[in-house]
Amino acid sequence: MMRDMTKGAPLGHLFLYAVPLLLGNWLQLAYNAVDSIIAGRFIGQDALAAEGVAGPVMNLVILAISGLCIGAGVLMSEAFGAKRTARLKETLATTLLFGAGLCCAAAALGCALTPWILRALAVPDSIFGITGIYLRITFLGAPFTFFYNALAAGLKSVGDSKTPLKFLAFSAVLNAVLDLILIGGLGFGIVCSAVTTVVAEAASALLAAVYVARRVPELCPGHGQWCIRRDLLGPILRYGAVTAVQQAVQPICKVLIQGQVNALGVGAIAAFNAVTRVDDFAFTPEQSIATAITTYIAQNRGAGQTARIRRGFAVGLRLELGYWLLMGSLTLLLRRGILSLFVAGEGAADVIALGSTYLGCMAVFYALPALTNGFQGFYRGMGKMTTTLIGTCIQAGLRAAAAAVLAPRMGLPGIAFACAFGWCVMLAFEVPYYFWTCREWKLPKASPSGLRPQARVEAQPPEAALSAETEAGSGPVR
């Protein structure tokens, strides 16, 4: 169901939009864990190692795909808010056609370069062959992953976050069932695991395509609209490239921090592996709320409803902080019990003690990424992708540097304080720039009056705003 966020109370829009995103992210986290369990238990250590090697490689492909789709999603949200249905359809068509060609080329190139990739990663000879087959099959599934993500971005841009969740749930269940039957029951190997993943991705893409074609005529391109519009492709690529680079920064930072943790010993490594699972469940909802903020602001910016933007952003920040209070309290109260689920046996008490100290600090610090994610959602909705990249680079760089200084002196809690330091400096950059952006765009202050309908102002076409600014999408709606 489409959701027009240019009218009505922001709280209802943001909450109802964010919940399906949150459930989808949790479902993905749970599925990844189940997939690894099935591979490890039914196929063996080599299969689990092959998946582990292929994972980071495919993550780079997924980063590029998601970056392109997020960029297109912001432009589609603007068009939907401005009631420019033709522009909405043309943006989706351009994204699908260009992305399909790009993904097919990337899949072919990836398959051809697989041996060189594995040698560069120093993959052991014992799993070289099986990892190569697994990676090639996974590469072939990239176009299906793109189609689903692009269509899901289109649905989310018109305020429908429930339908993509249904398709994701179907895909996850189908994949798990096929794995259990073909791998657990019939004894097929790791190749079957890769094939079932591709089949599930193809099924979700097909369901999304049929749904858009039959149920969402406002989004489905017509016969004459299936072409690549150069004036739309430029903004999509600029938005998407910056977003993809931004998403790549965090994994690099995690690798650097993992190196500091590794120097602390096996107990610290085990504890950090456990606490990062808790971190994922803390950060994911905050990111879901940020995505809701992005869609809300992009729709209202496209509609020229500037009086609603700051009001909706303020409500979004309250939701972020409300979730932090809930998650922080639960983490403080239950951290030892949660950690005991991940470790057992000899040395478990030491691991739980280390992890508990870390989580005690992070329970308080989770408020900081709640705020930074909220501001990131605001900037994405305003089209300021470069600003989000700068903020992320500041946070990741200082976090890694602080970890190198604090971890040897403080142990695992030093990692927590390094994270807090990076988030604080990120806020020191984002908050002043927020007020500058509000003045630049002449955004009225947040107040209940912002909920009343105002005269609709015709928004600039995305390409017009982009051509006038050095930063993608940084020009105000006139």
Name these PLM-found stretches.
Residues 69, 137-156, 164-172, 193-206, ...:
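Short runs within selected transmembrane alpha-helices of multi-pass transporters and secretion channels
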Residues 48-108, 145-164, 271-335, 369-383, ...:
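Small-residue-rich hydrophobic transmembrane alpha-helices
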Residues 16-35, 137, 148, 171, ...:
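Transmembrane helical elements of multi-pass membrane transporters/channels
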Residues 21, 25, 37, 74, ...:
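Transmembrane alpha-helix boundary and packing residues in multipass membrane permease domains
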Residues 1-18, 76-141, 185-241, 297-364, ...:
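Short alpha-helical transmembrane segments in multi-pass integral membrane proteins
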Residues 11-30, 34, 57-64, 140, ...:
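Residue-level signal for short hydrophobic patches within transmembrane helices
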Residues 30-49, 118-125, 181-188, 248-277, ...:
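Helix-terminus/linker motif at the lipid-water interface of multi-pass membrane proteins
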Residues 60-63, 107, 175-180, 204-209, ...:
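Hydrophobic transmembrane alpha-helices of multi-pass small-molecule transporters
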